[in-house]
């Protein structure tokens, strides 16, 4: 299940540069992190959902690529983003 519109708007407001900033790397990373966290709770109860697990791995890979890009282009924004999201790195 995807995120609700209100939850997405709250994430964009928190991580975006303005209210309509949906394309910046940090917003995309935050949205993917919220979806990944939601899917992890889904897999706690639905252990045999292998099709959904493939989608989860795809999201994790996409987030990793965005994090690598952000680290390469803006190191201080990268460190603040992973600290705010609670990601290890």
UniProtKB/Swiss-Prot annotation:
Gene3D superfamilies: 6.10.250.3130, S15/NS1, RNA-binding. It holds the Pfam family Ribosomal_S15. SUPFAM superfamilies: S15/NS1 RNA-binding domain. Keywords: Ribonucleoprotein, Ribosomal protein, RNA-binding, rRNA-binding. InterPro entries: Ribosomal_uS15, Ribosomal_uS15_bac-type, uS15_NS1_RNA-bd_sf. One of its GO terms (molecular function) is rRNA binding. One of its GO terms (cellular component) is cytosolic small ribosomal subunit. Belongs to the universal ribosomal protein uS15 family. Part of the 30S ribosomal subunit. Forms a bridge to the 50S subunit in the 70S ribosome, contacting the 23S rRNA. This is Small ribosomal subunit protein uS15.
């Amino acid at each position: 299940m995807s995120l609700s519109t209100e939850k997405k708007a709250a994430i964009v407001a928190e991580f975006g540069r303005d209210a309509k900033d949906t394309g910046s790397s940090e917003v995309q990373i935050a949205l993917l992190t919220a979806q990944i966290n939601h899917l992890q709770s889904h897999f706690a109860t639905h252990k045999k959902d292998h099709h959904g697990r493939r989608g989860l791995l795809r999201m994790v890979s996409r987030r990793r690529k965005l994090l690598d890009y952000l680290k390469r282009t803006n190191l201080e924004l990268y460190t603040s983003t992973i600290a705010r999201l609670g990601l290890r790195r």
